[in-house]
């Protein structure tokens, strides 16, 4: 007998908490769990005791790495929270959680406003069409500036963000907030850990400013809502309910972003922000239908949240749990699923049995017998399912689009210390690459050396740490290497001819290919322009395949060749001696022959680097960036410090943390985000080729 769902769909919220590292995201999540009754003692990230940060590495580093899914209850709503990491090395976790969320809370540091990683996650949320509210946190800190933070949303993100509250005081005097919709003040009692506050009329000294700001709020809503605009221009009274309904509609349409103020650490303002989550963020019924594909016909199928429809869910995270083993986090889009039943993994076309279903709460769990549309839960027993796989009713297979996985930019070699470590390391790498698609491991067949690659130094440090802690692998780690790429800068035509005719069956393949540079990020494209069968149909896929295989090893220094178009336009064949293998080799020869004419260059990853430093060290810091081949993009003031925005090649950033610490006496900080690939200067290209024993394409 099927269970009934506990919370109706319109009372369900699936939200993520997104932020730059150190904006106070984990503390904010903690407080949500505390006030919604899930935690009895508050944990602080900087003391290494937070409910959400449940992996050992996170406890040590005080940063959130794995998006733990947690269920909480606020008033009569269920809120599922996906805790997303704020560190740039873990953007796959953020992308992954944005895929399964319906709405998000963006947390800003009131001193800093919008920071580089805020820009990153904001852009990702735009890509996935996720409505957001903003929580300006750390209002208790010296230098906190609510208005400047709101302004940074306009200036740096071009967002129509407007305060729905104004803070009462700031830094030491921050004591609560004024609600600009209902025009009341919520003032906190210092002694009651934020669980008690008084709602009072707006104090006289704030009345004039509050009315001015309420008017600004109405004007901002009127810009995106015709009904409010008509009333506003006509001088009619706008009721609180009308204003809230208009804000909800505009927020769901991504035209408006309500902004709240508070201090999670000092337990102020979190409950009002939770009211914002239920008032303005979408339920699964409010979001656009999720588009899936029928694997048989390729037709698009729209998935509406409905328990009666066939089951369809996305596996968005695999975790290795110390208590239950392999845990698959799923988001149910439609239908329902009982524990013990079978599902079809439509991505791999294999049947899997769901043993148990768990509702997750940071690192504790409750077993449940059934999940419904809109739910987020952990499933045990799915052996072959990996991140991004579609799980569906066996009678109704559907493919939900998979996640876009960025390529790694950095790699290091790992050498196990003993034969026993080698075996353990193989198991560890298999599990870790399953969990995280941006982490790759490969063994060089010639040298036997294992290389791991990822999104940054911190990313790889943490993976090595996990191998040691979870799998007892002792290994030596090499120097970090940059993931260079190669590309063509000019058009070139080249012949590739492979002939072996010495008794017996020979080999014959002959092709003419035109290579042209492709747009950045477009990758490799193949065009078949053969007329009159000069290269027979059956050999054309081999030419394409031969090119792709040859491109993996590049033409200059063995790095993958990217962003190139290849047009096969002529060639010849031999009735007897031509084969798929011969045409594969011919294609690779054409690529090699084109290299010198096509202006082959080595590309290097360029990082967007933001350095924050006290003014007295500014000269040293700027000098150091220039010395690292950096280009300045601009500078701004922030809370008594200078913030330098620049672009620097990744190869020049190794060891920068130590340099910055010593040149600013530990007071400077920096963040870096991969931005684009760019050709290396000639002298550096020559060095790279020399080191790799490649050939110069002069």
Swiss-Prot record:
InterPro entries: EF-G-like_DII, EFG_II, EFG_III, EFG_III/V, EFG_IV, EFG_V, EFG_V-like, G_TR_CS. Keywords: Cytoplasm, Elongation factor, GTP-binding, Nucleotide-binding, Protein biosynthesis. It is found in: Cytoplasm. Pfam families: EF-G_D2, EFG_C, EFG_III, EFG_IV, GTP_EFTU. CDD domains: EF-G, EFG_III, EFG_mtEFG1_IV, EFG_mtEFG_C, EFG_mtEFG_II. The keyword Acyltransferase does not apply. One of its GO terms (biological process) is ribosome disassembly. GTP binds at residues 19-26, 83-87, 137-140. Catalyzes the GTP-dependent ribosomal translocation step during translation elongation. During this step, the ribosome changes from the pre-translocational (PRE) to the post-translocational (POST) state as the newly formed A-site-bound peptidyl-tRNA and P-site-bound deacylated tRNA move to the P and E sites, respectively. Catalyzes the coordinated movement of the two tRNA molecules, the mRNA and conformational changes in the ribosome. Belongs to the TRAFAC class translation factor GTPase superfamily. Classic translation factor GTPase family. EF-G/EF-2 subfamily. This is Elongation factor G. It comes from Lactobacillus johnsonii (strain CNCM I-12250 / La1 / NCC 533).
